[in-house]
C-alpha cells in the first residue's frame, strides 16, 4: 500500500532512519501574541471625493481568539462626512446588504469603538455589494488603536480590493487575504 504522511511525519520518519541521531524533544508551538486595541480604524490617504477620498463598506468584523465578532453593533464614527445612503452604524450591524459610506474630500475614514481594550485575532472587511475591484478601498490601511487612540498596529495598504479582505493575526506573517466569495 501507499503510505501518506504530512511533512512533519515525513521529517520524523527520515530522522528515525539514522539510528545515531537523537530525536529532538517536542517543543510546543508558541501561539502568536495577538494585538490588543479598543479602536479599529480604516483610512485612506487624503484625496478627492468621489475618486480617491471615499470608503463604502458593507461590514467590518473584528474577531477575538474564540471567534466572536467583538465589533457587532459597536459604535462607529468617521469622516470627512457621512453619506445619507450609508450611516456609520451599518458598518457593524451584521448586515452585508447595507453599507457605511463616507462623503467629501480629505481623509476618508471609519473608526469602530470596541468599548474597551480587547485582544484581536482577525479582521474581516466585506465590501459593498457590486464594488469588488472598484478601488474605493485602494491604499486604505487598518490601524488598531489603544484607549487613547495611540497606534498599536497598522496593516499594510489594501491593494486590489475584492469582496472580502481578511487580516489574520494568528499566522506567522499576517497579511491581507483577498477573496471574491
Task: Label the model's feature ranges.
Residues 1-21:
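Single-pass alpha-helical membrane anchors
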Amino acid at each position: 500500500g501507499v503510505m501518506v504522511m504530512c511533512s512533519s511525519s515525513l521529517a520524523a520518519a527520515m530522522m528515525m532512519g539514522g539510528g545515531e541521531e537523537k530525536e529532538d524533544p517536542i517543543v510546543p508551538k508558541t501561539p502568536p501574541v495577538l494585538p490588543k486595541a479598543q479602536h479599529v480604524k480604516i483610512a485612506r490617504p487624503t484625496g478627492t471625493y468621489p475618486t480617491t477620498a471615499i470608503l463604502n463598506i458593507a461590514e467590518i468584523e473584528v474577531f477575538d481568539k474564540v471567534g466572536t465578532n467583538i465589533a457587532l453593533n459597536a459604535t462607529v464614527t468617521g469622516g470627512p462626512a457621512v453619506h445619507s445612503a450609508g450611516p456609520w452604524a451599518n458598518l457593524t450591524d451584521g448586515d452585508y446588504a447595507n453599507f457605511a459610506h463616507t462623503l467629501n474630500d480629505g481623509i476618508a475614514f471609519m473608526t469602530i469603538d470596541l468599548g474597551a481594550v480587547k485582544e484581536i485575532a482577525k479582521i474581516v472587511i466585506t465590501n459593498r455589494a457590486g464594488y469588488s475591484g472598484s478601488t474605493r478601498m485602494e491604499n486604505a490601511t487598518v490601524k488598531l488603536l489603544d484607549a487613547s487612540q495611540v497606534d498599536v498596529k497598522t496593516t499594510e495598504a489594501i491593494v486590489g480590493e475584492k469582496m472580502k479582505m481578511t487580516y489574520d493575526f494568528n499566522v506567522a506573517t499576517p497579511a491581507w487575504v483577498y477573496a471574491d466569495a
